[in-house]
């Protein structure tokens, strides 16, 4: 990685804070590049004896092109490179939030010579190119911004603090040590003592196992990062909408005693034990002549196909019916599912239990109800939450320390595969130089994770997924 700022011909600018009409007390317009200070001095009028000193906040006004009209009252901060986020000269203009003030300030900045609008993720990309961040830290910042739960934010912060970088760099250095031993034997075997191939191979196997464990852990971490989609399915009037409202802690869906009340797919975003979950209340699935209701049923099938887990709700007071069995058969075999008996409050628990056993019998291939609950009273709610998290493997994600994103997972897996090929070369007693081929590939893959071995074209593709202003 480069440790001194890379010269960029253009200075970039963008709004670095979320902006919505009428929302937000303040917003930040960020500039980075060689003209940042000049542009800041041009658009911001600083009264009195205040001096433009690095890392000192100044008070002033953004003026229009004529210098007569005040566009906004602002605070401005100059950060001279390399002591800035990007490693370049950076100016941040803190103006009032909302829409119009921010837009006018940004337009005033972009009207200056040698300034253009920043591309998505371009500030972070410059930080990586200038050695202020490694690639895993930059990606972790993006994940921190997008985090939908406290646990996801904590996991992202570990990456921001360099947790992923340290882990990957340590593994890569261990491989580099082994590669240096091998290459020395290839070039100067006569001058060196014999190499213990078994010991070297054991070290490569240890690194491979650690990489495979990182990939396995990361798959569980995806649950915290991406969340789960849980589809509530069942016949009309079994209490799906009541269950959605219960879990959402608000009246998200209309609830009546009339079958077919829900005619579209309703969604509710919640967080359960640190896991972001999208609850999808589907229209009751049944045969119908109502075109509007049928449209809702079609969308229910689409929601089911996109779900991570299906919660099939049936009415305990009516028992398991042929329609329930038909719905169960429509759930894809590879989709995790839970059978949930609702309306347990309508009869004593002992009656509900006996009704469950008697009604299910062999009609569901020996499967029993996973949870009995009452969406009305909340009875069984905690059991349902635990069952959903366990079914999706989310419970196992709670203890993770670091979790690779998908790009990092793919590269770690590629490194592990390359090390497996190295082991095959050893088993076939191939010469040392055959070992080095795949070992170099593993080292290269790990270098791509941290950005030590990566092209700017690949960086462009990675950072294009970031938000503008980051």
Swiss-Prot record:
InterPro entries listed in its UniProt record: G_TrmE, GTP-bd, GTP-bd_TrmE_N, GTPase_MnmE, MnmE_dom2, MnmE_helical, P-loop_NTPase, Small_GTP-bd
Official protein name in the record: tRNA modification GTPase MnmE
Subcellular location: Cytoplasm
Keyword annotations: Cytoplasm, GTP-binding, Hydrolase, Magnesium, Metal-binding, Nucleotide-binding, Potassium, tRNA processing
Residues at which GTP binds: 237-242, 256-262, 281-284, 342-345
Chain residues that bind K(+): 237, 256, 258, 261
CDD domains per UniProt: trmE, TrmE_N
Gene assigned in the entry: mnmE
GO BP: tRNA methylation; tRNA wobble uridine modification
EC primary class: hydrolase
Residues annotated as domain TrmE-type G: 227-393
Known function: Exhibits a very high intrinsic GTPase hydrolysis rate. Involved in the addition of a carboxymethylaminomethyl (cmnm) group at the wobble position (U34) of certain tRNAs, forming tRNA-cmnm(5)s(2)U34.
Enzyme Commission identifier(s): 3.6.-.-
Cofactor(s) listed in the protein's UniProt record: K(+)
PROSITE patterns: G_TRME (PS51709)
Keyword Methyltransferase in annotation: no
GO CC terms of this entry: cytosol
Family: Belongs to the TRAFAC class TrmE-Era-EngA-EngB-Septin-like GTPase superfamily. TrmE GTPase family.
Binding residues for (6S)-5-formyl-5,6,7,8-tetrahydrofolate: 30, 92, 132, 470
Entries under HAMAP family matching the protein: GTPase_MnmE
Keyword Metal-binding appears in the UniProt entry: yes
Cofactor info, note text: Binds 1 potassium ion per subunit.
Binding site for Mg(2+): 241, 262
Source organism: Prochlorococcus marinus (strain MIT 9313)
Subunit structure: Homodimer. Heterotetramer of two MnmE and two MnmG subunits.
A single GO molecular function term of this UniProt record: GTPase activity
TM spans (from-to): none
């Amino acid at each position: 990685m480069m440790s001194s700022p890379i010269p960029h011909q253009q200075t970039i600018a963008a709004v670095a804070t979320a902006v919505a009409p009428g929302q937000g007390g303040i917003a930040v317009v960020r500039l980075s590049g060689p003209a940042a200070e000049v542009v800041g001095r041009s658009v911001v009028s600083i009264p009195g004896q205040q001096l433009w000193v690095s890392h000192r906040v100044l008070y002033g006004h953004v003026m229009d092109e004529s210098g007569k009209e005040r566009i906004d009252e602002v605070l401005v901060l100059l950060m001279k490179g390399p002591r800035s986020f990007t490693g370049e000269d950076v100016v941040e203009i803190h103006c009032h939030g909302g829409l119009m003030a921010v837009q006018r300030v940004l337009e005033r900045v972009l009207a200056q010579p040698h300034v253009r609008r920043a591309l998505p993720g371009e500030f972070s990309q410059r930080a990586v190119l200038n050695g202020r961040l490694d690639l895993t830290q930059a990606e972790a910042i993006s994940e921190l911004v997008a985090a939908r739960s406290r646990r996801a934010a904590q996991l992202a912060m570990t990456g921001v603090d360099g947790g992923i970088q340290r882990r990957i760099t340590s593994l890569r250095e261990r491989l580099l040590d082994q590669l240096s031993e091998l290459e020395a034997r290839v070039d100067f075997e006569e001058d060196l003592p014999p190499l213990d191939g078994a010991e070297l191979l054991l070290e490569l196997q240890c690194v491979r196992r650690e990489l495979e464990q990182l990939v396995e852990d990361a798959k569980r971490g995806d649950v915290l990062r991406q969340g789960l989609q849980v589809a509530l399915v069942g016949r009309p009037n079994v209490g799906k909408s009541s269950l959605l409202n219960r879990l959402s802690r608000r009246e998200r869906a209309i609830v009546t005693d009339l079958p077919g009340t829900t005619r579209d797919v309703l969604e509710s975003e919640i967080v359960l034990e640190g896991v972001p979950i999208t609850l999808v209340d589907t229209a009751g699935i049944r045969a119908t002549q109502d075109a509007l209701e049928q449209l809702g049923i079609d969308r229910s099938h689409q929601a089911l196909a996109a779900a991570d887990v299906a919660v099939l709700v049936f009415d305990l007071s009516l028992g398991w019916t042929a329609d329930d069995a038909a719905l169960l058969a429509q759930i894809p075999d590879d989709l995790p599912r839970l059978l949930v008996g609702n309306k347990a409050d309508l009869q004593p628990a002992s009656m509900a239990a006996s009704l469950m056993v008697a009604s299910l019998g062999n009609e569901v291939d020996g499967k029993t109800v996973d949870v009995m609950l009452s969406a009305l009273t909340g009875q069984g709610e905690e059991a349902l939450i635990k069952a959903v998290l366990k079914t999706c493997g989310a419970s196992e994600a709670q203890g993770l320390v670091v979790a690779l994103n998908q790009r990092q997972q793919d590269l770690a897996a590629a490194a592990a595969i390359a090390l497996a090929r190295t082991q095959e070369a050893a088993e076939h007693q191939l010469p040392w130089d055959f070992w080095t081929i795949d070992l170099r590939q593993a080292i290269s893959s790990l270098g791509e994770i941290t950005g030590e071995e990566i092209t700017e074209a690949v960086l462009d593709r990675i950072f294009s997924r970031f938000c503008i202003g980051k």
